[in-house]
Each structure stands twice: as C-alpha cells, then as structure tokens.
From Swiss-Prot:
<keyword id="KW-0804">Transcription</keyword>
<feature type="binding site">
    <location>
        <position position="454"/>
    </location>
    <ligand>
        <name>Mg(2+)</name>
    </ligand>
</feature>
<feature type="binding site">
    <location>
        <position position="903"/>
    </location>
    <ligand>
        <name>Zn(2+) 2</name>
    </ligand>
</feature>
<dbReference type="Pfam" id="PF05000">
    <property type="entry name" value="RNA_pol_Rpb1_4"/>
</dbReference>
<comment type="function">
    <text>DNA-dependent RNA polymerase catalyzes the transcription of DNA into RNA using the four ribonucleoside triphosphates as substrates.</text>
</comment>
<dbReference type="InterPro" id="IPR042102">
    <property type="entry name" value="RNA_pol_Rpb1_3_sf"/>
</dbReference>
<dbReference type="GO" id="GO:0008270">
    <property type="term" value="F:zinc ion binding"/>
</dbReference>
<protein>
    <recommendedName>
        <fullName>DNA-directed RNA polymerase subunit beta'</fullName>
        <ecNumber>2.7.7.6</ecNumber>
    </recommendedName>
</protein>
<dbReference type="InterPro" id="IPR012754">
    <property type="entry name" value="DNA-dir_RpoC_beta_prime_bact"/>
</dbReference>
<feature type="binding site">
    <location>
        <position position="62"/>
    </location>
    <ligand>
        <name>Zn(2+) 1</name>
    </ligand>
</feature>
<dbReference type="Pfam" id="PF00623">
    <property type="entry name" value="RNA_pol_Rpb1_2"/>
</dbReference>
<dbReference type="GO" id="GO:0003677">
    <property type="term" value="F:DNA binding"/>
</dbReference>
<feature type="binding site">
    <location>
        <position position="60"/>
    </location>
    <ligand>
        <name>Zn(2+) 1</name>
    </ligand>
</feature>
<dbReference type="Pfam" id="PF04997">
    <property type="entry name" value="RNA_pol_Rpb1_1"/>
</dbReference>
<dbReference type="InterPro" id="IPR000722">
    <property type="entry name" value="RNA_pol_asu"/>
</dbReference>
<feature type="binding site">
    <location>
        <position position="819"/>
    </location>
    <ligand>
        <name>Zn(2+) 2</name>
    </ligand>
</feature>
<dbReference type="GO" id="GO:0000287">
    <property type="term" value="F:magnesium ion binding"/>
</dbReference>
Length: 1213
C-alpha cells in the first residue's frame, strides 16, 4: 500500500472511462436519497449503503452483523460490507450515461481545449453539442468538407441529394467524441511543425496554440476522446451530506440536487430509447442530460444557472473548489485548530519579555488533558473520567497542578491581521486573575496592538517538537530585530520614552548642583532625601563603576553627570560606555573627556563650562538597543529591555507629567503673520484681475502664501517653546505627537483638502486652543472622513498585495550553502536626481562580496572576495571613497528552486548568516506587504501646470511595479548608446524630437511638447536611458537592455517609493520578489530540441534542455526573457496545486489535467495542501532524517549556536 504521508509528487490527468469504473463500488440508478419514514438510505440511490458503505461503524444495514469481529464480511441479507463508516468519505459510485456528454471545462474554458484539438471554433462546437447543427464526420465520396456544419434543413437536403448512407453526419457530444477519436496526434503535430516554419502573424499564433494542446495530449498519454464522458463518477456521500435539522427537515448539499437531475434525465432517456421514441424527443432529452451534467460540473458557466429554493444558484463541483470559501482556501490552506482561545488584551507592565498573562479559567480549559494526566499520575483520581470530573467541579487541588503543567510550556499568541511573522510569537504563560490576556508592553509594536479593546488568540503547541520550536525559534525575547530592515522592533514607546527622557534631563542651578558622590547609592540617598534633584549636575567617582570600559586617562577621576543619568546608566549592560550624551560617538567610542575633573579642579567651574545636554529621546533609545544587540545578542538585550521598561514607567509616574489647556502656549505675533498673509493674497488677486497671471498661477501663489504663513507660525512656536512644557516634552522625546499636532493646537490649522482632493484656498486660521468657527469646523470634517475611508481601502489593497507577493515567492527557500556562481551585481548608492534614496553603506551591510574591494587611492585590499561585509566593514569601504562594489546577489544566484546562503547574506532578523531552510521568500513578501498600509493611496500631481504626466506614487505605484503594468506618465527611452546631438521643437504637432547619434546610426525619438526633459544636447546616454522624466516601462527596458538592468531598475523603483514614505526595507527582500518575476523565458527558435516555439518555461529547465543538445553537437534553442507580473507569475508556477489555490482554479486544473502535470511539492503551499510538513526550517529533509550520535567529549557551545541547529543537528539525506 502507498504510504499516504510519504510521496514524492502528485499528478493530475484526465480520467478514462475504465479508470472511473475502477474507482466505483457500484452504479447509482435511482435519484432517491433516504427513505422519509425509516431515514435509511434507499437501495441503488445516491446514499446507498451497498455502494458506499455502512452508515454506522461495524454494522450492516439490516443489523444482522454488529461488532468489529465481523470486519470485512458482506451481509447475505442486505449486501452491505461490515466496516468503518468512514469509508463513506472515500468510496465512489458511478452513473452509466445513456448518451455521451461533453465536459464543460474542456469545451467552454478559454482557450477551448476541444476546439483547439479539432480545429473548430467554440461557437461551432456549441451548436453541435447542444443539438443545433449536424457536423460532417466522414464525407465518404461526397464533396462535403469534413467537420463542416449543416443545419437540420441542409442535412435533409444533402441526404436527398446524395442518398442515405452516402456520408456520415451526427449531432451532440457523440459526434464530437467520434471526431476526437479520429484525431491522429502524431500526424497533426508534424503538420503543424512544418506549417510553423513559414507561417506568420495570426496564422502562426493559432498554430502555436494548437501545437501546444496537441503536444500536451501526446506527451501526457491522455486521449482526446476522454474530454467527452460516457460514465460519470459520483463523489462519496459524506462529501455531499444530508443532515437532519431540529425541525425534522433536512439540509442537503446542492450536489445531491444536481446529481438527482442527471439521474432523472438519464433514466428518462434510457426509457425513451427503449420505446424507440421519435428522434426529436430523444434529441431534446439528450440536450437536457448534457445541460444537467454541465450544471453538476460548473453551474452557471453556460446559460442561466440552475437555481434552488429562493432562486439561489446551486453550488456545483467547481464552486466547491473556487474562491475564499472553496476547498483550497477554506479547508486546505487554513484550518481551525483545537486548543485555542481568544480574549481581550490588557497591559502587563510587570511581565518579563518572554511572559504573557493567561486567565486561570482559560488556562485550565486549554491545558485540560495535561492537568488530567497529572491528576491520574498523582493518584488524586483513579481514572481519566474521575480526573475530568475533578477539573469540571473546580477542585482546589487542580490549581497547583495547573501551575506545574504550564511551567516551561510555551503558548503562542496571535493578533489579526497577521501581517508579518511577528504577528505570532511564543510566551511562557503566567496565571493571572481576571478574564483578559496580559501582554508585555514592548511586544505591542510587533503586533501593532494597543489596549483599546483589541483581542488576541492563544494557541497551545502540543507535541514535544512543537514546544521545542516555540521555545527556541518563536519566543518573544528572541525577536528583537524586525526581519524587514534588521532594526530593533521592540523599542520603548510612550510612557517608557517619556520617563527615560525626564530622567536624563539636565538643568542648571538645581538643588545639589556640584555635590560629589562616592558611588550610586550615595547619589540615590541624596536624591531621596531631597538634597539633590534628578536633573542636578553632580560629580561621581569613576572607580565606583570599575566594569565600565573607561579609557586609562579617565580612571580614578571624578566625572560630571546628573543623578538621573547615574540611575539611567545603572540599568545598562556593564560593557557599554557610560552614556552622558545622546549620540553615537558616546555610545560606540566612550564617554567624552570633557566630563572628567583633573586633580585639583573645582567642580563648579567645570559644570559652568559645560553646555546643557539634551535628554535621551526615542531614537537614541533605539540606537542603544541596536548596539546592545550587536554586542550581546538576545538574552542580555531582552533583560536590558525589561530594565529600561521598568525604569521608564517608574520615572514617568514620578514625574507626573500632565497636559492641560494652559500648557498650550499663545503665539505673540500670530495676528501680524496672518495679516501679512491676507495682504499678500489680496495683492495676488489684484494681479490676477489685471491679467498679469493665469488662474492656475494665482491658485498656486495663494496656497503657497498660506503654507508659508503656517510655517512661520510653526517656526515661531519652536523658537518660543519652553523645554519643560509637558506637551513639548512629549513631542520632543518622541513619546507621542509631532510638531504638526502641536502647531494645530497652538498655531493655525492651515489649508484643508476639498472633497475632490484639491486644496481649498481658504485656510483655517484658528487653532484648537482658540476653537474653530462653525464654517472652519465644517471645512475640516472632509479631511477627517477622507482619512478614515482611505485607511479602510488601503488596508484591503495592501492585504491583497501581500497575498499575491506571498504566493509568488512561497517556494523560495535557502536550499544550499553556496551555488558557486561567478556572476555578481555591481551596486552603488540609489539616487533620485540629486537626492540619495539609499546609501551604499546601507546596501552593503550583511552581503557577501563577489570580487575583492580595493582602496581607490592606495590599492590596499579592504576585503577579499566572497567575504561577509559587516556594519563596520561597510563604513570602512564607504569612508575609503569606494563608490561601487560587486556583491553576491539573489539576482545572480544559480540555485534551483531557491537561493543559496552566500547570495542572500545575513538574515536580518538575527543579524547572523542565514540558515539553510529559511523561508526567505515568505519573509520577503511579508516585509514588502506589511508596510503597505503606511503608503499613501493618492496619485500625486506634480504641482499644477508644470507637467502633463501624473506620477503614480505610494501603494498604486508598488502594485504597478510588481504587476509589471505599463506605468502612468511613461518616460521615453533610447535604444541607441551615444550622444544627444539635437533637440528640436515642432510647434505644429506640439512635440519635440530628440536625436541620439550612436556608433551604428542615429536614433530619433518623438517626445510630447509638455514632457520635462532629462537630457540636454551633448549628454552621453546609454541604451535604455530615459530621455524624459517619468517611469520607464520595464517590459520595454527588457527589450532594449538585459535582465539584470531591469532587475536593478525595479529594485531602485521599489526602494524609492518606500524610502520616500520613510519606510526602510532590506534590498534582498525586493531582490527575491523581482527575481521571481523574471524566472521564465519564452522559446523563440527550438533548434534541435523538442521544445515548442512560444512555450513559457523556467530558465533552469530551458538550460537543461539545451545542455544535452549542445553535448551531442546539435543546434540549441534560443529564447527571450519574459517579465511577468506577480499574479501571472503565481499562475505560471510549476506547481499546479499552488496555482489552483491562488486564483482561476478551474482554468489551472483544466490545463494541468490535459498536460498530465506532476507537482513535485517543492514549495510551502503544496505541502500544506496535502498535509505534509513544509520543506522549510526544521521540516527540511536534511534536518529530519537524523541519526542520534553519542557525544565523545564535552563540547562548549556559545549562545548564538543554541538555536534550531543545536536541536536538529542534521545529516543530509
């Protein structure tokens, strides 16, 4: 028997009639389902126990044989086999059709596979199949054309003309079946190949299409006549159940209705044929049978759908697979799980980073089996049943057992929407009272959670392996860095930031200034007793902190700091320098010398000579966390984060910062600024009335004036603000709010957008402190509503984008250590005009070099080939003045079905080299999709009249890039490398002509008159360079340049959109996605290979096909790279399971069946669908078949290695 859980591949083909008979356990002859009195299935009906198996385990229908000991016996009275009732989910029946019936998928799909096989138009097919015309099958000696159509009348006329039996013509699916049987595949294929040598245009396209389908039949071993059914399989009854409702009525699956119609019509047809009924009646019945089978397979595909009660269309077999509610997406890719719960979340500020609070009653329910096992083991109860009763009664002893059980048993917490992998993390449960789950405040950022009523789901990993993986790979304390950019994702926010900001403030002349303390305890004592303030600048003996990395010159001295900073530094890791200034120099190089007293110096003099430092803000805390992580990795960092959190909360509470209306300052010269603006607007309008400017110019000038007025108020606000003002502190520290919120409270609200998106000329002059007038209030409501609707629309759009991205990249996994490629990618900083979008330093970090990098002046080798570039190395390379470096890149990786470690570089989420088995495709998709909601929806207009092209930005632009659509505002590109020799304007046609002189000839390009030029006369341009502003069409670029240029261009474009919105994403994520769009080629000339011209295929398959031919000395095939949008790329994937579960399910399956496609189960989705463990991470073959080995000597493993590999030390198969 086949081991159901271990198979290499899965194939789908057309089912031959003999195959369907071999599946079947009997013929369904009657349309009855169950008897309304006995509620037992009817004999020979759709639920018959003889065919499909017994309804009760180990019991035949009449009850003669009961119990498992009769297993396998067939009852002599009722004919039912004694077996499990589960077989009713797997045993099929069949219906012998009295007339052949065409399968709607193959006749109606686009393109019609039947039509292509027979070289007939779908319309002609429809007329024949539905009995509207005859088709000539064999003309014999008559001048009739084979496959030509005859109407009823023409048929009779021709019969009279040529005599009966002089030619054969039929109608209905039977005729089509006869024609399909006559197709000689080999001959037709040879003929078409011959035709292709000379054909062109429309004729060639059609020939290529036909050749594709005929070749598919030829190679797969499917016979064309199997597209017409003589026998119809009946799916198992438990997959189309009938259930009794409370009121005694029945709810049945729609499929039963559809099968019933087929059986009724089939039986009626059989009776008519027995009675030798007139031809027209039989014909009508055959047509009705055809329609009934069509409705069963795909209701509504042709004509009006068959409806049930309340004119609701019935769900056919195709609908069971399609869409979000279909079998694929509803049951195979997303299942509901047991051992899960859901509750509102509340903040748990006392929790450690790896803990979460679980309510007692929830925990006892989730861990019930574990608790019951312990109760029995401790002999509090004799058996499981008694243990269960104990738990349900709420016996006092169960709580102690529960405490033991949950110790070291992690649980998973998930918050919807799960936009990236940090949306599910593992925690150790801590039992709490109440009914809300408690969440650690620092993980909120990763979950995007807040405590205004959010809910979260909790899941329990059951098996030992699942617990080990949760603990080692998913524990929240391990997820310090964000996979999308490698920056810390657990930065303190709000109160924590505010507390640490307040703590590290400095103030001149506060009580206790100039005191000198011997150590921290003395300073704290002075502060607690009111002798010194947190912000007072005081001295402390350096020797009281001997473990800090002081310079030799700083030891044994007194250092000037504040009491607050002494407390702040006390929680820092010991090896980190003493932080006195909030900057990177202090963090990486050590405390500046100016804070140390020379022997005999007066401390007050030194204090007076020092400037007052700004406090530590959110950004600085982020840098400290990143540095801590870089030096000490996860364990120390997560402990430090907890200390930072506690300190922040404690001091924000002590500071008691509050906000009242009096805290909003009044700007002294607001009236002057506004009067000046009114005056300026009046002048502009006067100039317009005199005809000195156009209306567009006037509009731009007026809105600019008001914008400048708002900025002037903002500037004044910043100048006059008091650093001790609580609102200013909140804003400045990065805890909440920004300058624009502040200026709306204290300055003016400024210009608002009108419903059409255009900015209104009338600004809102009031601020919120003064209060708005009714008209102003009305003006501002529109913006608020638009904000809400935009967000809602954006969320849906962004979610769909993520789904498509995941689908196209889900099979990209790190598959090997090094692919050994000799290609690389030359990179330099990404610029947009003069602005730098992404620096070279950022692009180099965490990548491997392809060639060694030399110092441009000294020629010294800075780093060898194939070396990992660290953060420090990247800085060193850039500081040396290097402008471009050749690195290993995903674009040039030679690994099949994935990427190798060296081409990928470091895993941004851990900061270490990526592991074999990491699902980098999915991570890339999440990293690009997750910030999608932060991107704007709008299409920007480039300032009024300046240009006629709207440049798309934000989310729509990202979609445009990844779907490889023709961009809005397309740039004209040159196909010639050379110099721009002339740009002439032609007023009559409103165009400009650009002439580029190349080596081989002159290129002439017509450009719209209004387009902004990117080149001037004398400029040197490369092939594919843009002559005008705008986006280049990537497909056009691919024709002019090569694949790598297109990949580099798309990468830069994606980065421009995200960086302009302040979102950072690692290059490698975009590289993974873009590579997936360019993994196919189209065969142009097959040479001596047996490839077909026009075929789309994977680059690796194409090179394989050529390899053998080249070795044997033949002519290799030629091809052209193809750029596909992500949706198209997902549907063109080699895995039909993955494609079918994505979109257009019926089309994908139709095509796969004809080709007899094999799915080798390489990606993640395919394996989830068939219920196998995914081939990534610990599910990879090399980590699974492991031989345990004894350790000879005691090995010491450092912390970074104690991750997945330590548990799964793997032997490759």
């Amino acid at each position: 028997m086949v081991d159901v859980n271990r198979f290499k591949s899965m194939q789908i083909t057309l089912a031959s009639p003999s195959k369907v008979r071999s599946w079947s356990y009997g013929e369904v002859k009657k349309p009855e389902t169950i008897n309304y009195r006995t509620l037992k299935p009817e004999r020979e009906g759709l639920f018959d126990e003889v065919i499909f198996g017994p309804t009760k385990d180990w019991e035949c229908a009449c009850g003669k044989y009961k119990r498992i000991r009769y297993k396998g016996i067939v009852c002599d009275r009722c004919g039912v086999e004694v077996t499990r009732a589960k077989v009713r989910r797997e045993r099929m029946g069949h219906i012998e059709l009295k007339a052949p019936v065409s399968h709607i998928w193959y006749f109606k799909g686009i393109p019609s596979r039947m039509g292509l096989t027979l070289d007939m138009s779908p319309r002609a097919l429809e007329e024949v199949i539905y009995f509207a015309a005859y088709v000539v099958i064999d003309p014999k000696d008559t001048p009739l054309e084979p496959k030509s159509l005859l109407t009823e009348r023409e048929y009779r006329e021709k019969l009279q003309e040529y005599g009966h039996g002089s030619f054969v013509a039929k109608m209905g699916a039977e005729a089509i079946q006869d024609l399909l049987k006559r197709v000689d595949l080999a001959a037709e294929i040879a003929e078409l190949k011959e035709e292709l040598k000379s054909a062109s245009g429309q004729k060639r396209i059609k020939a290529v299409r036909r050749l594709d389908v005929l070749d598919a039949f030829n190679k797969s071993g499917n016979k064309p006549e199997w597209m017409v059914l003589n026998i119809l399989p009946v799916i198992p009854p438990d997959l189309r159940p009938m259930v009794q409702l409370d009121g005694g009525r029945f709810a049945a699956s729609d499929l039963n209705d559809l099968y019933r119609r087929v059986i009724n019509r089939n039986n009626r047809l059989a009776r008519l044929l027995e009675l030798n009924a007139p031809g027209i009646i039989v014909q009508n019945e055959k047509r009705m049978l055809q329609e009934a089978v069509d409705a069963l397979i795909d209701n509504g595909r042709r004509g009006r759908p068959i409806t049930g009660p309340g004119s609701r269309p019935l769900k056919s077999l195709s609908h069971m697979l399609k869409g979000k509610q279909g079998r694929f997406r509803q049951n195979l890719l997303g299942k509901r799980v047991d051992f899960s719960g859901r509750s509102v979340i509340a903040v748990g500020p006392t929790l450690k980073m790896y803990q979460c609070g679980v309510p007692r009653e929830m925990a006892i329910e989730l861990f019930k089996p574990f608790v019951m096992r312990e109760i029995v083991a401790k002999e509090y109860a004799g058996n499981v049943k008694a243990a269960k009763r104990m738990v349900e009664r709420g016996d006092e002893r169960i709580w102690d057992i529960l405490e033991e059980v949950i110790k070291e048993h992690p649980v998973l917490l998930n918050r919807a929407p799960t936009l990236h992998r940090l949306g599910i993390q593992a925690f150790e449960p801590v039992l709490i009272d109440g009914k809300a789950l408690r969440l650690h405040p620092l993980v909120c950022e990763a979950y995007n959670a807040d405590f205004d009523g959010d809910q979260m789901a909790i899941h329990v990993p059951l098996s030992e392996e699942a617990q080990a993986e949760a603990r080692l790979l998913m524990l929240a304390a391990e997820h310090i860095l964000n996979p999308k950019d490698g920056k810390p994702v657990v930065t303190p926010s709000q109160d924590m930031v505010l507390g640490n900001y307040y703590l590290t403030m400095e103030d001149a002349g506060r009580e206790g200034e100039g005191m000198i303390f011997k150590d921290k305890d003395e300073a704290v004592m002075a502060y607690r007793n009111g002798y010194a303030h947190l912000h007072s600048r005081v001295g402390i003996a350096v020797d009281s902190m001997p473990n800090k990395p002081w310079k030799d010159s700083q030891r044994h001295k007194i250092m000037v700091t504040t009491v607050g900073k002494i407390l702040f530094n006390d929680i820092m890791p010991e090896d980190l320098p003493y932080l006195q200034e909030p900057n990177n120099a202090n963090l990486t190089e050590g405390t500046p010398d100016k804070y140390f007293l020379e022997p005999g110096q007066d401390i007050q003099e030194v204090i007076d000579g020092l400037e007052i430092n700004v406090p530590f803000k959110k950004k600085n805390l982020g840098n400290i966390i990143a540095e801590t992580f870089k030096r000490f990795r996860t364990t120390e960092t997560s402990a430090f984060l907890d200390r930072l959190k506690d300190l922040g909360y404690y001091h924000s509470t002590l500071a008691g910062l509050t906000v009242g209306i009096a805290d909003i300052p009044v700007i002294d010269n607001k009236a002057e600024i506004i009067d000046a603006a009114h005056h300026r607007v009046e002048e502009i309008n006067k100039a317009f009335r005199r005809g000195l400017m156009t209306d567009d110019d006037r509009y731009v000038a007026v809105t600019t004036t008001w914008r400048e007025a708002k900025e002037a108020l903002e500037k004044r606000l910043i100048e006059t603000q008091d650093p001790k003002n609580p609102i200013v502190m909140m804003m400045d520290s990065g805890a909440r709010g920004n300058i624009s919120n502040f200026s709306q409270l204290a300055g003016m609200r400024g210009l608002m957008a009108a419903p059409n998106g255009r900015i209104m000329e009338l600004p809102i002059l009031s601020n919120f402190r003064e209060g708005l007038s009714v008209l102003e209030m009305f003006f501002s409501t529109h913006g608020a509503r638009k904000g809400m609707t935009d967000t809602a629309l954006k969320t849906a759009d962004s979610g769909y984008l993520t789904r498509r991205l995941v689908d196209v990249a889900q099979d990209v996994i790190i598959r090997e250590d090094d692919c050994g490629t000799d290609r690389g990618l030359l990179i330099r900083a990404i610029t947009d005009g003069k602005e730098v979008t992404e620096t070279l330093e950022e692009r180099l970090q965490g990548r491997y070099t392809r060639k060694s990098v030399k110092h441009p002046e000294t020629g010294e080798v800075l780093i060898g080939a194939d070396q990992l570039i660290t953060e420090d190395m990247a800085r060193k390379i850039v500081d040396a003045g290097v402008e471009e470096v050749t690195i290993r890149s995903v674009f040039t990786c030679a690994t099949r079905h994935g990427v190798c470690r060296h081409c990928y570089g470091i895993n941004l989420a851990t900061g270490d080299a990526v592991e074999v088995g990491e699902a980098v495709g999915t991570i890339a998709a999440q990293s690009i999709g997750e910030p999608g909601t932060q991107l704007t929806m709008r299409t920007f207009h480039t300032g009024g009249v300046a240009s006629n092209t709207d440049i798309t930005q934000g989310l729509p632009r990202i979609q445009e890039i990844f779907e490889a659509r023709n961009p809005k505002g397309e740039a004209v590109i040159t196909e010639v490398k050379g110099n721009v020799v002339e740009i002439e304007e032609d007023a009559s046609t409103r165009t400009k002509k650009v002439y580029v002189q190349g080596k081989t000839g002159m290129g002439e390009y017509v450009v719209p008159f209004t387009a902004r030029m990117k080149v001037e006369v004398g400029d040197e341009v490369n092939r594919g360079a843009a002559l005008t502003e705008g986006s280049i069409q990537p497909k056009r670029l691919l024709e002019v340049r090569d694949t790598l240029s297109v990949e580099t261009y798309l990468l830069a474009e994606v980065q421009k959109v995200y960086r302009s919105q302040g979102v950072e994403i690692g290059d490698k994520h975009v590289e993974v996605m873009v590579r997936q769009m360019l993994r196919k080629v189209r065969v142009m000339d097959p040479g001596d290979t047996d490839l077909l011209p026009g075929t789309l295929m994977d680059i690796s398959d194409f090179t394989d096909a050529n390899k053998d031919i080249v070795i044997s000395g033949g002519i290799p095939a030629t091809s052209r790279p193809v750029l596909m949008g992500i949706t198209k790329a997902s549907l063109e994937t080699n895995s039909f399971l993955s494609a079918a579960s994505f979109q257009e399910t019926t089309r994908v399956l139709t095509d796969a069946a004809i080709r007899g496609k094999k799915d080798h189960l390489l990606g993640l989705k395919e394996n989830v669908i068939i219920g196998k463990i995914i081939p990534a991470g610990t599910g990879m073959a090399r980590y699974r078949n492991i031989e345990p080995q004894a350790m000879n000597e005691i090995e010491v493993i450092d912390h970074t290695e104690v991750s997945a590999e330590a548990v799964f030390t793997a032997e490759a198969e």
